[in-house]
Curated annotation (Swiss-Prot):
Sequence repeats lie at residues 28-56, 57-85, 86-114, 115-143, 144-172, 173-201, 204-231. Resistant to heat. This is Allergen Ani s 10. Keywords: Allergen, Repeat, Signal. It comes from Anisakis simplex (Herring worm).
Length: 231
C-alpha cells in the first residue's frame, strides 16, 4: 500500500516538473517601473513568454529611475543597436534600457506624436492623455535639460507660468530625469524655499522625485543659477 502511494506521488511530481514552463526573464532591476496609476506586475503575458514581449502596444516606453536592468534577453544583447527608437519620446532611464519593442519602434513616430521634449511616457501605454495639453504641447512642454519631466498618468498643464519660461527654469544638469508618478512633490528643500522665484510652482503632489542616481539636494550650483536666471 505504501509502495503504491509512493509511486503515485512520484508520478505526480514528474508530471509537475515536466509541465512547468521554463521561467522567463522578468522585469526587475534597481529601478521600479513608474506609472501614475501604478503598473504592478506589468505584463504578465510578456514575462511568461519572451517571444510575445514585443507585441506590446501603447504610446510610451518603459521608464525606470535608475534603469530596469536586463529587461529582456534578446533586446539587451546588442548594445550598439539598442537606442534606435523613433519619435519625440525616447526610452527614458537613468542607465538606459535599449531597443525594447521592435513593433513599437517601427511605429514610434505615430505612437509618440506628442510635441515637446517632455513626452507622456508609460510602460503599457496611455493613449491620448491630455487632449488640450497635446494640442499645445510644444508650448507646454518646452523644458530644457538632460531629462524631461515624466509622469505615468501625465502631468497636464504642469506649471502655467513655469512652462512659459521653462528654458531658463529647467536648465538642470545631471545623470537622470526628474520622474514622478503623478506629480513632482516636495523636490528639493533648498530649491523649494526659492520655488516661487525659480519656477512659480506650488510645492506638493503625491509623486516622489526619482532620478538615475538619486537626487536629494542634487545640484546646488544649478539651483543657485536658476535663481539668478530668473532675476
Amino acid at each position: 500500500m505504501h509502495l503504491i502511494t509512493a509511486l503515485v506521488l512520484l508520478l505526480q511530481l514528474i508530471h509537475f516538473i515536466t509541465s512547468s514552463p521554463i521561467p522567463q526573464e522578468v522585469v526587475g532591476g534597481p529601478g521600479p517601473v513608474v506609472g501614475g496609476s501604478g503598473i504592478g506586475n506589468v505584463w504578465e503575458k510578456a514575462n511568461e513568454q519572451a517571444a510575445e514581449q514585443q507585441n506590446i502596444g501603447g504610446p510610451g516606453p518603459v521608464i525606470s529611475g535608475s534603469g530596469i536592468g536586463d529587461v529582456w534577453n534578446k533586446a539587451n544583447e546588442p548594445a550598439e543597436q539598442q537606442e534606435n527608437i523613433g519619435g519625440p519620446g525616447p526610452v527614458v532611464s537613468g542607465s538606459g534600457i535599449g531597443n525594447v519593442w521592435e513593433k513599437a519602434n517601427e511605429q514610434a513616430a505615430h505612437q509618440q506624436s506628442i510635441e515637446g521634449p517632455g513626452p507622456v511616457v508609460s510602460g503599457s501605454g496611455i493613449g491620448n492623455v491630455w487632449e488640450k495639453a497635446n494640442e499645445q504641447a510644444a508650448h507646454q512642454q518646452s523644458i530644457e535639460g538632460p531629462g524631461p519631466v515624466v509622469s505615468g498618468s501625465g502631468i497636464g498643464d504642469v506649471w502655467n507660468k513655469a512652462n512659459e519660461q521653462a528654458a531658463e527654469q529647467q536648465n538642470i544638469g545631471g545623470p537622470g530625469p526628474v520622474i514622478s508618478g503623478s506629480g513632482i512633490g516636495n523636490v528639493w528643500e533648498k530649491a523649494n524655499e526659492q520655488a516661487a522665484e525659480q519656477q512659480n510652482i506650488g510645492v506638493g503632489g503625491p509623486g516622489p522625485v526619482k532620478s538615475g542616481s538619486g537626487i536629494g539636494n542634487v545640484w546646488e550650483e544649478t539651483n543657485e543659477e536658476a535663481a539668478s536666471m530668473q532675476a
